[in-house]
Amino acid sequence: MPDTKEEHPDIPSENKFIKKTPNFVGWAVFVFTISIVIISLISVVFPALIASNNSTAKALEEFGVVLLEVDAFQAGIWAASLLAANFIVFVIAVLYFKKRLPESIKNAINFVFSFEVSKKVAFIALAALLVIYVGASAGELAVEEEWEDYVGLKKRVDNWSPDQVATQFEPHVRYFLLWSSLLLFGNYAVIPFLASISLVLLTYFFTVKLTKKRFAGIVSTVILLQSNIFLTYDTTVSYTNFWIVFYLLSLYLIFKAWPLSPVSYFLSIPSKAMTVMFFPMSLFFIYRTNISRIKKIIVAASTTAIILAGLIAASVYGINLSAVAGTQDEFDSDEFWLGFTSFSYQLRFDGLVLLFILPLVVGLFIASRHGFKHAESMMVLLGGMLLIAPLITGYTDQTNQPYRFVPFVVFFAISVGVLLSRRKI
């Protein structure tokens, strides 16, 4: 049954929620995120459009190289579904706010947004989801991995020892956890699998913390567990979820044990250095939280100090960060724009994400306009995660890999839960 205001006193009242507040930050965040999302969706509708305008392809044609002729405006396999789904969602939304929907449909929508479950029901539901997930995935632990990076990583972990931590910049936290997994369980994949289970639990508890609704947490958990890209990399040794767990934990700890948040963020970096790029998103999240100002300053300053300390240490020990990251001599605009196309093909099996990312962002903006600050934070996280792919290809010689979209899927799932935080729309 729905919970009450007394049960969750920090939930805004309906009147407070409905009262719109002028918010320049909200508009800026929305414009940023919706722009990134729309550019990313171009390749879902027209897969060849961005690639066809690549200057490299044009240069090859000028040199007489015959390229395969591709129609830049040929629709992708998800194009019709994307347009239809978005049209239906936005029409229903407009009719709802214009009070033109049939009463039965309106009541059904209100029921979904106001529905809540008891702690007991939430515990049973979460436990059932975990049992199903673990039971379906545990068999993968006995299967030898076939990723190309696995052989090299296995050799590196076999030769790893704790005394190497201070000698070179590598993902030593990841090596340590894989080394520990082999030492304790005789299998490299056990602790990575436990990390994925932890990520599922964190998704639930983080969503509940943001929304004050257990039902929202269950919905977010279901969305994550149905994700193809999450299930593809949940037991992998080559592309573990350690970095995502530590990063999401750093955000969660801002509410639960704020002095430990920078520690968790620090651990995410030697799990995968790419989390350094999450730094601006972390600062914005801290800025929009409801903790006291002094706590915000301390957490933000500590997190900033971690980045600065890493840069200073690299300088002192002569570590070439450009070489580590594979940084190019100059920015490659062609590769930058091609980076946006990775969204369409890396997530081609995650139809839920492709079809509803645009309505989700619009929904988050509406929620932020009605006073829910966490909606802005989720927009920044979604937009930032999508922007990382083109930044990587534009500034480094690295290619975009599907596993890098796992944190995006996690925040997509949490964002859906955030929409359900509203008691009534």
Which functions belong to the PLM regions below?
Residues 232-240:
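Short acidic/glycine- and proline-prone juxtamembrane loop motifs at membrane-interface regions
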